[in-house]
């Protein structure tokens, strides 16, 4: 039977790699601690701090405690450091040159490999699919599940193919390809799918350009994005610290070459795009699907016939502060941000530097460049890119997520407009009231110079899209300024936080069988909500993510809609502030694609804490849908007609009953069955309040059997310290000795 790339990885693997950061992990480690469980595979787990940390200079850095001023951010970072020590995990802290954004450090270390399954409590884990890996974001409950069992309960997605044929024109980059695709399919176009990107335009791209495309696949609604590995992939990985070596390398490459879709493989959805149709592209609204070529005008909602789409456009334009039919090149900006897990790698910085060299940013613009890792920063400085940027008036920063989302000091002020290389332009994403326009690094650089959204093709140094792998080792061999000091630091390195311990998988304590309240029936007045693409930033803004607990977030639910930003007073018109709906346990949303955006489990936690345990909509984003079940909540998908019927009764304040046992929704004068919408296992767990980690741990013998098969078949997937394999933290070479690779 012919299989796709996704089919092959799905059939062969469980969970091979787990990346951990400070925002979505505290509650997971607390769950392990409370259940007396250990991390099953420390050798397959890598942790770092990235979301909360400042990107200011670290020349005087001593510790997280003294460096991070904001209390909640500091607590999350300190908690991660405590947890990695207690659970014996590899950790790249702020004093480590290898620290950076999780989706940058994984590939540059060779932790990400073709054919692996990669997970992280971050929706942009899809980045790693550029290597032919199946990589997807997970919620905190699933983070805990992977830590405890190195497995996940998953339903297979559909296969979707996006084929881009032809040659990209000058000035068009992989970011433009990604935005163009999202504009075509919409933010829900890839829902329940894994997208395989292929075609001559994709095959010509460098690994870093491919990562940008796969990174954005989540914004098209997909569970993951994948690109088949090839010689460009192998050359990128060769010699990376955690890539296989010698005979194992040869065996790995032989396997990796088989990771491509068979000629007659079937796809559920097939999209074909001509590369010549793609122009430098930006967003104009508050959703990644709100895109247009830079040469276009702001769209006019009056030209749209669909009422829901028209309303969404009007809302977006009101927030973003644009007038229909205005040329996009006449839109003035206040800030420019080059960074994020989408566009902070060395090729991105080279592309932007080629535009700004010898020029200066507009007088009214603040512009910043934030490298994706300490190693990228060092490489850029060796190439003199930092000087190019600072001479042009840019701020040169340390590695971190920075202004991609306003969880750290790098934020927009209300009303400020930013040309950004990040991945989301949701309301308030970069700061409360901030206005975000997504674009490529070259486009952001051009906007910073001119002070307006700008067609990069008008600049003399128009960069071509990268088409070849970067020079060998360029981002993994940082120069050692002080060899003696470095050797001393390596000798004194904490063996717990710098390398995983030798030994077999460890689990302590009996499995805990029940951790959730049972869900059988809910009855009451449902709250109606008529908004499309309700995203996770709308459900719970980023400033409320700085918690190490699962509780106390009910007051933050729909914060921007419920409260006046100036006074903090309730907005009486918002549905959950109205007396009839203050105690609603059911929410009925008439718009599609509910819960799109981040993998943050804080969204269902906020609903649960408010008291809402059932959400009814026409469609849900995949990660939010899964996260609901992990928290004893029931998301129900119905037709538009059925949802509209329930919304009508909700508006009339009539009671609705959701009966999960019999899988029916009852309302005055009728009922709606939802038999086919809930899988039997999920129903069983909800009705009985079962903890699926405990259920999985009952399959320990099956997990051990798979691990033995993996060690035999794909030995390079075991960590360097697994079951007594030799491991040593090595120093980086000096001028008098050949440089050694960074190791764990």
Swiss-Prot record:
Binds 1 [4Fe-4S] cluster per subunit. It is an enzyme of class 4 (lyase). GO terms for cellular component: 3-isopropylmalate dehydratase complex. SUPFAM superfamilies: Aconitase iron-sulfur domain (SSF53732), LeuD/IlvD-like (SSF52016). Keywords: 4Fe-4S, Amino-acid biosynthesis, Branched-chain amino acid biosynthesis, Iron, Iron-sulfur, Leucine biosynthesis, Lyase, Metal-binding. Its cofactor is [4Fe-4S] cluster. Pfam families: Aconitase, Aconitase_C. The keyword Amino-acid biosynthesis applies. It catalyses: (2R,3S)-3-isopropylmalate = (2S)-2-isopropylmalate. It comes from the Eukaryota. Belongs to the aconitase/IPM isomerase family. This is 3-isopropylmalate dehydratase.
